[in-house]
Amino acid sequence: MDTRPIGFLDSGVGGLTVVCELIRQLPHEKIVYIGDSARAPYGPRPKKQIKEYTWELVNFLLTQNVKMIVFACNTATAVAWEEVKAALDIPVLGVVLPGASAAIKSTTKGQVGVIGTPMTVASDIYRKKIQLLAPSVQVRSLACPKFVPIVESNEMCSSIAKKIVYDSLSPLVGKIDTLVLGCTHYPLLRPIIQNVMGPSVKLIDSGAECVRDISVLLNYFDINGNYHQKAVEHRFFTTANPEIFQEIASIWLKQKINVEHVTL
C-alpha cells in the first residue's frame, strides 16, 4: 500500500478531464493537480519553452511527494515526456499512446483524425504511434489553436465556441470514422465537436484512456492506495485565477473543490 498522491500536470484546466475519470475508476487514490493556466496555451510556444515550463510543473509535483506523475497534457507529452521519464525514478505516464491505441481499436474504415495544439500536430506523434501499431490506418491531423483559449476562458457553451469548432473541423467532416481529441482541453467541447462531426464518428478522449494505464502501473509497481479509505483529500493548484479554475472544475468534476494559487 502506498498512500502518496498521484501527480497530474497540465497547461491549464484540460487535465481535469483525466482526473474526473481517475476519480470514477480509482476513487481511493489521492490526487495533486497543477494547471499552468497563467501561461496557457502551451501549443503555440517554442519547444524549449514548453520543456522549461513542463520541468517547473514536474519539480513542483515532486515537492508534493507524489508516487507517479501523469502528463495530462498532450503538448507536454509530445515535447518533454521521454526526457522526464528517463530522469525520474517514479513512473511517468503520458496521454498519447493510450489515445493512439484506442483509435486503432475504434476505427472500422482505417480513417482516423487527430486534433490537437499546433505543437502536438507538428510533432506528428499521434500519426507515428498509430502507424507504428497499425501501418494501414490513414491519419489526418489538424491543429485547432483556438480551442484551448475557449476552454480556459470558460466559454465552452457560447455561440462563439460553436462557430469556432464548426469552422475549425470542417476539413475533417465526412472523411474519418474516428477522431482523437489530442488535447485534454478538448473533451470540454465534446458535445459541440460531436455535433459537427456527426453521430457516426467515434470520439477518443486520450486523457480518459490513460487512466487504464495508470491502474496497470499502480499494480505493476505495487503502489496502489488504500482501497478501504473512503474520504480521500485531493489538492488542486493553478498559476492563474483560482476562482475561474474552481468554476470550470466544479462543472466537470460535479463537486466543489478548493483551489490554491501557486507561483512557479
From Swiss-Prot:
It holds the Pfam family Asp_Glu_race. Substrate binds at residues 10-11, 42-43, 74-75, 184-185. GO terms for biological process: cell wall organization; peptidoglycan biosynthetic process; regulation of cell shape. Pathway: Cell wall biogenesis; peptidoglycan biosynthesis. It comes from the Bacteria. Its EC number is 5.1.1.3. InterPro entries: Asp/Glu/hydantoin_racemase, Asp/Glu_race, Asp/Glu_racemase_AS_2, Glu_race. Keywords: Cell shape, Cell wall biogenesis/degradation, Isomerase, Peptidoglycan synthesis. The keyword Ligase does not apply. Transmembrane segments: none annotated. The active site is at residues 73, 183. It catalyses: L-glutamate = D-glutamate. PROSITE patterns: ASP_GLU_RACEMASE_2 (PS00924). GO terms for molecular function: glutamate racemase activity. Gene3D superfamilies: 3.40.50.1860. Belongs to the aspartate/glutamate racemases family. Provides the (R)-glutamate required for cell wall biosynthesis. This is Glutamate racemase. It comes from Streptococcus pyogenes serotype M5 (strain Manfredo).
